[in-house]
Amino acid sequence: MSEMTPREIVSELDSYIIGQHKAKRAVSIALRNRWRRMQLDEALRHEVTPKNILMIGPTGVGKTEIARRLAKLANAPFIKVEATKFTEVGYVGKEVDSIIRDLTDSAIKMVRHQSIEKNRFRAEEMAEDRILDVLIPPAKNNWGQAEGTQEPSATRQAFRKKLREGQLDDKEIEIDLAASPVGVEIMAPPGMEEMTNQLQSMFQNLAGQKQKAHKVKIKDAFKLLIEEEAAKLVNPEELKQQAIEAVEQHGIVFIDEIDKICKRGESSGPDVSREGVQRDLLPLVEGCTVSTKHGMVKTDHILFIASGAFQVASPSDLIPELQGRLPIRVELQALTTEDFERILTEPSASLTEQYKALMATEGVDISFTADGIRRIAEAAWQVNESTENIGARRLHTVMERLIEDVSYDASEMNGQSVIIDADYVRSHLDELVADEDLSRFIL
């Protein structure tokens, strides 16, 4: 679990997301409260429930990006799902309980990776010993059993030194590795993925663990053996318990496009993918127990963050019970020309930096002037205003159109420089921006 302070979390998010300070503050406080809760006495800790968040804002302003970056910062089980993928229980489609199952699967992977990293040093020593056993085989007695290494310890240590210095990296050896389980492809109707996974696991377990000889270079063998030895040091039952505890105490679920499951007007017939899904989400958000293949998981202390554009519907169109379980509301603002300028230059790996790096691979030096960046931002904002406002995603379309000629000819422009200033931008974009029909279909 992350121990970062709210200020540190916001600072980290600032490196990738421009503006939206209120949303950053809300998620940073929610993330810090996870840590604060774990410092309390057990009796009080059980009573402190997470304050779920609803992020409201037009498309392309950073809602999903906040979720992506938060996943890396959280150091906790995290899953992002689309609300539109689910249907009401009893109909064809994914049930909302699969959110918790997928979250538990991701926690298993996370905890396994942490356990392997924790045991890596020991695994490296064991991998070295296995390679040395191949290079210096132990002598065998009359019954074909190993009597132990007969060579003097100095010889083994000399080979170990060479191995660690990389002198033997390119030497080929034959080692026995666990064979990959035979894949059994099972087709199942939508919503029955859990049954498919269980059947596949059953067939793989029936096949058993077999060893297979591989002829590889020592440097590749070392990596493979480390992974195999580290996996042996992991206790599967302990792994499951740690993963389930991590989900229950620190798990975060991000539900995107929640506005798409709002009921719109009066309709006859069942609302299997709208209001029905909201009703199914209620127990998860409030707290219930979900059965997974790894064990029972309680959702009482899982943090839920929902987001939606709410351009057609409004938050009040959610059923009242679900509204009450999303107490923190954060409104994200539409992006301005100034925001677009900052997006083009300030974030780590900004769009301009990406295009510079891509063209540099062909030996072409691209530079963007301040007035050129300003004009790109104005063009993107203008197209958003005159057609459909898709926020910062418009910059990708505009930049691709702007760099198209250079990108096409780059392989024949080795050693040349291209300066993208306001005049360059006008000559490539102004005609498209001015013509609403063209900008609607091209930009």
Curated annotation (Swiss-Prot):
Annotated S-S bridges: none
Q: Which Gene3D superfamilies match?
A: 1.10.8.60, DNA helicase RuvA subunit, C-terminal domain (1.10.8.10), P-loop containing nucleotide triphosphate hydrolases (3.40.50.300)
Annotated residues for binding of ATP: I18, G60, V61, G62, K63, T64, E65, D256, E321, R393
Q: Which UniProt keywords apply?
A: ATP-binding, Chaperone, Cytoplasm, Nucleotide-binding
Q: Subcellular location, in the record's words?
A: Cytoplasm
Q: Matching CDD domains, A to Z?
A: RecA-like_HslU
Output the InterPro entries linked to this UniProt entry.
Answer: AAA+_ATPase, ATP-dep_Clp_protease_ClpX, ATPase_AAA_core, Clp_ATPase_C, HslU, P-loop_NTPase
What's the domain of life for this entry? Bacteria
What's an example of a GO molecular-function annotation for this chain?
A: ATP hydrolysis activity
Asked if Transferase is a keyword of the record, the answer is: no
Gene Ontology CC annotation, any one = HslUV protease complex
Please classify the protein's predominant subcellular localization into one broad category: cytoplasm
Q: Tell me, what is an example of a GO biological process annotation in this record?
A: protein unfolding
What the record says about family reads: Belongs to the ClpX chaperone family. HslU subfamily.
Q: What does this protein do?
A: ATPase subunit of a proteasome-like degradation complex; this subunit has chaperone activity. The binding of ATP and its subsequent hydrolysis by HslU are essential for unfolding of protein substrates subsequently hydrolyzed by HslV. HslU recognizes the N-terminal part of its protein substrates and unfolds these before they are guided to HslV for hydrolysis.
Instruction: Spell out the subunit comment.
Output: A double ring-shaped homohexamer of HslV is capped on each side by a ring-shaped HslU homohexamer. The assembly of the HslU/HslV complex is dependent on binding of ATP.
Q: Which HAMAP family match?
A: HslU
Name assigned to this protein: ATP-dependent protease ATPase subunit HslU
Q: Which organism is it from?
A: Pectobacterium atrosepticum (strain SCRI 1043 / ATCC BAA-672) (Erwinia carotovora subsp. atroseptica)
